[in-house]
Each structure stands twice: as structure tokens, then as C-alpha cells.
């Protein structure tokens, strides 16, 4: 997981998973991620989870994905997002391709007009620790008096995979 400044405004920090390096070709076909024409291995985790997606909470499937370099992580999908089939993304020189682990509710490199390919100069550093975690709708985040019901203490200070 990497912290970077979004290319759109060069100010907003995003934390996303680094998926593609310069020269890599990425594509999503029927919800499956392909890296350099190789389908990324994905193993379903049998327990569905609830996630926040804008103003609604969705029950989604989670998967362990394994990149060609052996790196494993958990990603969630609901198979109803708008990015189930994409054109090929070819990562330019000195740029990187990022995706959120919450695939169907993530603004990331797949959205070329708002995030797109991230230049090396926009990289801030590696995210290594979950400092704070709560389970609220984004609109409720600023209502701190409701946090006691939604704080996920079990995730505090966990190492990010």
C-alpha cells in the first residue's frame, strides 16, 4: 500500500495498492484482473463482509488475490460495479497503476480523468500501519459523538498487508 498525491490536484493523499509498474499492461475482464495478459489468481473467502460504498452498505464477497511476485492481499468485490470490463491500461514510463482493495467503490488508476496513472514524483511513501478504523457512512464520519458505536478497535495499529 502506497501513499500518493492524486494527479488531479497534486494535494490530496490517497492510499492504494500498487498493482502496475511502468510498461505493465492491465485489464479487467468479467471482474477478473489481468496483469501482462496473465489472470491474477483469486481465491474466494467464504465469509461475505459488509462495506461502505458511498451512502450505502453492501454485502460483498472477499477474495485473496495473489500477484505474480507472490504478494497476497484481500480485495472485495460486489460484481455490480461499472469497472467489470475495461480497455487495456498500459502504464507509461515513470508512472504507476494503483487500485483500491474495495474494488467496486474505489476511485483509483482505472479512472483516468480523476486519478489515472501516477507519476513517480507524486509518490509519498509506503503505508505500514492502520492508525484509526471505523465502520460508518462517509457522511457520519464527522459526527464524532457516534464513533463509539462504529470504532473497530481490533484494527487499530495493525500492520497493513
Question: What is the predicted function of each stretch?
Answer:
Residues 1-161:
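Soluble "head" domains of membrane/secretory-pathway proteins
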Amino acid at each position: 500500500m502506497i501513499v500518493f498525491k492524486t494527479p488531479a490536484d497534486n494535494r490530496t493523499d490517497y492510499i492504494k495498492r500498487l498493482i502496475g509498474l511502468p510498461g505493465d499492461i492491465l485489464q479487467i475482464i468479467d471482474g477478473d484482473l489481468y496483469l501482462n495478459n496473465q489472470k491474477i489468481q483469486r481465491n474466494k473467502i467464504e465469509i461475505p463482509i459488509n462495506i461502505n460504498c458511498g451512502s450505502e452498505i453492501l454485502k460483498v464477497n472477499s477474495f485473496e488475490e495473489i500477484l505474480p511476485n507472490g504478494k497476497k492481499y484481500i480485495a472485495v468485490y460486489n460484481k455490480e460495479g461499472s469497472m467489470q470490463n475495461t480497455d487495456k491500461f498500459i502504464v507509461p514510463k515513470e508512472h504507476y497503476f494503483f487500485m483500491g482493495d474495495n474494488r467496486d467503490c474505489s476511485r483509483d488508476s482505472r479512472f483516468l480523468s480523476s486519478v489515472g496513472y501516477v507519476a513517480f514524483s507524486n509518490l509519498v511513501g509506503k503505508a505500514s500501519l492502520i492508525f484509526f478504523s471505523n465502520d460508518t457512512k462517509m457522511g457520519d464520519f464527522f459526527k464524532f459523538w457516534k464513533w463509539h458505536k462504529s470504532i473497530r478497535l481490533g484494527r487499530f495499529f495493525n500492520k497493513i498487508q
